[in-house]
Amino acid sequence: MRRRLGTSIVCILAFSISLSVESMASESTDEAEEKGFKVVRTIPLEETSFTQGLEVMDGSIFQSSGLYGGSNLREIDLQSGNIIREMTINDSYFAEGITVLDQSIIMLTWKEERAFRIDISNFSIIENFSFEGEGWGICFNGEHLVMSNGTSQISFRDPETFEINHTIQITWDGQPVPNINELECVGMEILANIWLQDVILSIDSISGNVQYFISPASISSTQGTNSNDVLNGIAFDKSSGGFWITGKNWTHIYLIEISHQDTTSEIQETRGSNWFSAIFILSIIMLLILLSTFRNKNEPETPNFKGSTP
């Protein structure tokens, strides 16, 4: 009976340890890490823009600006911030996000359910696409056009037909993330702004999970005079490996490098402490097993009176 009870206790404790270890492993996988960043370069803009999209190509920044009656597409010099050329969009359209596709730019519109394909060489519209719902942000991952519509869903579209191939839901620590806005594709990673929030998310393009995030509040706090002048616009710079970011009606564009945040060490220390506790408890269990085995070997065998004859 004593041996059976000891075995049961050991099994229960071992099972508890396995659940604890599994929980810690799941926690380390699912939780989005906060990363830090540093500003390595700043470019003043010649004119402010109600920024909706941002792209870098061949030493220039391409920037789309929204608002009815004020929408446009600009090419901006990456050294001076001066406007090289500008294309005015029809007053009936509210321009949204942009992305480079081959030698053209795909531009979304907000509520008009229309996307334009614009020739980069002369800023002329060469093709139109229709889609259902609102258009917010867009990027090209080398295979699909990835598009947001202000919800927690993003769609992956055929670059030739603009038809939806599949959609995924964006989740942050298991919760859906609404208001996904400007997008930037870098390999299998998607960088995204959230409308009205000072945060940039890194999203896994397969699962939709947020992998890490940065909070550029230190930059946005120096920009804008009203609630609409929010962080919006992300462009990957292949030459530096950094990201250009800006916002609506901002006076500057910033090149940032993303790095690990010092505060993550606290999370790592906590997880390390949890692992140490698990190992310590497991060691105690092993010691109890050894002591129990040693005691059983040295105790005299108890006769089985039930089976003996009188």
Regions found by a protein language model. Name each.
Residues 81-117, 125-135:
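Blade-loop segments of beta-propeller domains
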